[in-house]
Amino acid sequence: MELKINDLCDDVIVNIFEYLSDNDKMNFMFTNRYFSYLIDKTFYNDVHHYRLVHNLPFYNKFKKIEYYASTNNIPNGITHLVFNDEFNDNVDGRIPCSVKCLTFGKSFKKPLKPGTIPFGVEKIIFKSWYNKSISGGIIPGSVIHLEFKTSRKLSKGDIPENIRHLELICNNQSLGVIIPRNVKYLKIGYNILLNETTLPYGLTHLVFDYNFNGKINGFIPETVTHLEFGNKFNQPLEIDDIPSNVVYLKFGTDFNQPITSKVIPSSVKHLEFGYYFNQPINRGVLPQGLISLTLSCKFNQILEPGVIPDTVKILNIYPSNVCPISIGVIPSRLTHLNIVQELNQILDQTILPETLTYLRIPHCYNHPIKPGIIPLSVTELEFGSNYNQVLEIGTIPPNVNSVTFGTKFNQPLSKGVIPNSVKKIRFGFEFNQLLKVGDIPYGVTHLYLGNRFNQPLEIGVIPESVTHLDLGYCFKQPLEIGMIPSSVTNIKFSMYYYLPIKRGVIPDRVKHLNLNYIYTGCDPDFIPKSVTHLQFDLGYNFRLIDFKIPESVIDLEISRAYYPIGPKIIPNSVQKLSIWDYKGEVTDDIVGKNVVCLRVSPLNYRGYEKYLDLGIEFKTY
């Protein structure tokens, strides 16, 4: 017997829905009239904004409701509560018991009382410094994630024992009785003093913030696997200072201390040295089993063969003057090689192992690269800033799927130079060559034409496979229907495109459209009805919006809208709206029915006070 999906009982379908996003659930239900009745029987697990769902008859089926509070009038049922950055009012008795995630904005300074934050809240973030007391159970025991900065000294019990994730800056030098013993992730700042009781056993992720520069003395627990030092840390390290289970180790900007044998434990797989590190590295210092190594800008030491373990697969070298690399220095199984600045030798098999999949050619390198030099295994290729040589067929290997040209590259292309395997092409600042049909191979999906590009395009130059197109900064050539292929879904126009755009030039499949400047002679309906994300600039001539913004747009950004925005300009579909330069009154025509995020000039703050109870996220920066 043939089983149809309609034969499945409702409970089975609802259970399947638990593995889908809410958007996928809706799409599934609307494919069949039979399933549409499940809308109010299904639970929705993604985060949804209160303004978009609170009037729905199945509102109680949404498990996560987000609300941005600009006043202390907060509706019940909110689970994700964010106080906007301008908010600084009393919240006693105002936070619903349904809240699970709570964020206080940058201006919040009011004192909190025990019970103000209800038990049940699991995550609290203070975005700015909070210098009022949190003693006496102000942070409830249900909280497992806390981000908190204060210039006060904390006492034992201020931070609940159940905390698992803690990001803390306070005025205590000793934190032994402050940090709960259950913490797994810890980020701490200021120059605290470590002792044997400071850090809890069981901690796995430890991040020292910017100012820490204290002695380690072996006080980091053995359970730590992820360790990051802040930019100010520059203390000598002894054996056992870095625990034997650390897998990820990162040093900050200032660290420049000798590294001797066994200081870095054999467990480390990912190692990153900071900006000023410039110490000799002897053979045997770096652990066997290391996978990723980063040497930063000031490193200027000769690397002998065998210093970098053969297990390393990712190597990042940032110095401006790399010492010559001899045979045996580069591991034979390397997959990612990123030499950023300068290399005083010719690229050959000494430097380029046959296992490479990612290669960045140094910025200062400008020697011809013949076919066969770059290994066939490379799939992602970046040329440095100075590279400006004619490319032969075969220079870019046939397996490359992403190629980025540097700032100065400005050479003509011919068919076959860029292989058919390439999916993404990014030209650099100076590129301004006439492109012919076939120069960009069919199969390319992402094409960035470079800031100086200003050449006429004929139909077929941009292949029908392209979905993401950036016309660069200077492009100002007339566009006719068909020049931008129908496959394109994302387009960015240049800052200087002062030409009229006819209806049909922008294909009907485009969803993301960045116009920068809109010329006055455009057809009123030149923006297709498929666009969901729209950005445009009205220029300095104080013009009105005299073209239609489609009802499909949900994310809208308008620059230099100096005249008042009247009715029927902003469609009701818009959920995120940015009118940064707008000086007019914020009205119902702007806020609409569905806007949940509004970005306006700080000068306009008083202009939207009457909308503060809508739960909208207001941004003034």
Curated annotation (Swiss-Prot):
Keyword annotations of the record: Repeat
SUPFAM superfamilies: L domain-like
Domain of life of the organism encoding this protein: Viruses
Pfam family, one: F-box
Keyword Repeat carried by entry: yes
Transmembrane segments: none
Sequence ranges of the FNIP repeats: 87-128, 130-171, 212-254, 255-298, 299-342, 343-386, 387-430, 431-474, 475-517
InterPro entries: F-box_dom (IPR001810), FNIP (IPR008615), LRR_dom_sf (IPR032675), STK_FNIP-Repeat (IPR051251)
Gene3D superfamilies linked to this entry: Ribonuclease Inhibitor
F-box domain residues: 2-47
Official protein name in the record: Putative F-box and FNIP repeat-containing protein L60
Native source species: Acanthamoeba polyphaga mimivirus
